[in-house]
Curated annotation (Swiss-Prot):
Protein name: Glutamyl-tRNA(Gln) amidotransferase subunit D
InterPro entries with a match to the protein in the record: AsnA_fam (IPR006033), Asp/glu_Ase-like_sf (IPR036152), Asparaginase/glutaminase-like (IPR006034), Asparaginase/glutaminase_AS1 (IPR020827), Asparaginase/glutaminase_AS2 (IPR027475), Asparaginase_C (IPR040919), GatD (IPR011878), GatD_N (IPR040918)
Catalytic activity reported: L-glutamyl-tRNA(Gln) + L-glutamine + ATP + H2O = L-glutaminyl-tRNA(Gln) + L-glutamate + ADP + phosphate + H(+)
EC number: 6.3.5.-
Subunit and interaction comment: Heterodimer of GatD and GatE.
Family the entry assigns: Belongs to the asparaginase 1 family. GatD subfamily.
Length: 418
């Protein structure tokens, strides 16, 4: 029995048929069923295996491809940090291959040839839950190198779980006249409902636009007619599996991008690039990694805060209830943090709306204890911002800058309800 064979597996009460695939576990047999889904079965539970059809030895062959730069199109670099947004599937085995040479990208998504001149580069190959702050700095350095080598737009392929953290980090780290677009896929490229190809087409299109800044581009609805371009510090993943999981919070998206017609419709004012400074990039990648994000809950113990202080943490983001509150029983821990020069700031776990710690006595008392209100900053953004500030400024200056708008993280509109 070889990889690629079409087999029938008999269990006690049922049978499964499909193409035999590679397995990472020697005790598990994996097959790809005709539905396109993979199933892994415990070898001990399999009563009988029948080879229905012998398969050819799997090959990952590529036809020759002649790529010539189109002088009428912009030069876009696509940097991969991992994920499946532009991977290529060998349907005989189900194996997923990274597709990050220019040739591979065009084969995976040939429509890109009509949008831009593509250069592909792998900088990381990790699951996004394994993203580390040092990788944000590595990504920023790769962006700088590509821009200085002539890239007129950057697309970063990223796993969706922590993409909003990375977008936030790059918003604080990178100052450039080139658009930086993070893109991912909620459905892998071997599934009929995959959003990978359309998202990357729309992201590359957005990267050719005359704008600057860091953005996230993902499906704007469950269908395939529109993708949304979100500001990097005002976006969050709000669903575990839907294709339109990413939403702008307390702001509308920057634009709608039709991945089929390639039309871009701006929904509000954007930051336009200065062509004369197209190769100028300023990086500030210093981060204080001893920062924690703590969700407040009924009965939360001050010992939690004391633990972080005693272990050398320099900053704490509290994701408080409502307008920015904690139980009074938590005040002791906040006093302890303040006495030890640990910067404590407050966001709200409601996600939408803004912190207002002047309404109730609880919030006013927290402010008196040195807790900084973070306006309508998302908790994840406040977490990254505090790492950035403490990595670059002294305590008092960081404390002063925390409630100020640096990279679009605060919506200063007086019309925002809270």
């Amino acid at each position: 029995m070889d990889i690629g064979d079409f087999v029938k597996l008999e269990l006690e009460n049922t049978t499964y048929s499909g193409t035999l695939m590679p397995s990472l576990n020697e005790n598990t047999i994996v097959i790809k069923m005709k539905s396109g889904y993979n199933v892994g079965l415990d070898k001990k539970k399999i009563k009988n295996i029948e080879i229905l059809e012998s398969g050819d030895k799997p090959k990952y062959g590529l036809p020759p491809l002649n790529l010539e730069k189109n002088p009428k199109l912009k030069n876009i670099s696509i940097l991969s940090t991992g994920g499946t947004v532009a991977s290529r599937v060998d349907y005989k085995t189900g194996a997923v291959h990274p597709a990050f040479t220019a040739d591979d990208l065009i084969r995976a998504v040939p429509e890109l040839m009509d949008v831009a001149n593509i250069k592909g580069k792998v900088i990381l190959n990790i699951l996004s839950e394994n993203m580390l702050p040092k990788y944000w700095a590595m990504t920023a350095e790769a962006i700088k190198e590509e821009i200085e080598n002539g890239a007129e737009g950057i697309v970063i392929a990223h796993g969706t779980d922590t993409m909003h953290y990375t977008a936030s980090a790059l918003s604080f780290m990178v100052t450039s006249e080139v658009p930086i677009i993070l893109v991912g896929a909620q459905r892998s490229s071997d599934r009929p409902s995959s959003d990978a190809a359309l998202n990357i087409i729309a992201a590359v299109k957005a990267a050719t636009e005359p704008i600057k800044g860091v953005y996230v581009l993902m499906h704007g609805e469950t269908g395939d007619t529109v993708c949304h371009l979100h500001e990097g510090t005002k976006v969050r993943k709000l669903h575990s599996s839907r294709r339109d999981a990413f939403k702008s919070v307390n702001k509308t998206p920057i634009a709608e991008v039709n991945p089929v017609t390639k039309e871009v419709k701006y929904l509000r004012d954007v930051k336009s690039r200065d062509k004369s400074k197209i190769k100028e990039v300023v990086l500030n990648t210093n981060l204080e990694e001893k920062v924690a994000l703590i969700k407040v809950y009924p009965g939360i113990d001050s010992e939690i805060l004391k633990f972080y202080v005693d272990n050398g943490y320099k900053g704490i983001i509290l994701e408080g209830t409502g307008l920015g509150h904690t139980p009074e029983t938590f005040f002791e821990g906040i006093d302890y943090a303040n006495e030890n020069n640990v910067l404590v700031a407050m966001t709200t776990q409601t996600i939408n709306g803004r912190v207002n710690m002047n309404v109730y006595s609880n919030g006013r008392e927290l402010q008196a204890k040195g807790v900084i209100p973070c306006e309508d900053m998302l908790s994840e953004v406040a977490f990254v911002k505090l790492m950035h500030l403490l990595g670059n400024y002294e305590f008092e200056e960081a404390k002063e800058l925390m409630p100020k708008n640096i990279a679009g993280e605060i919506n200063e509109s007086i019309n925002l309800e809270c």
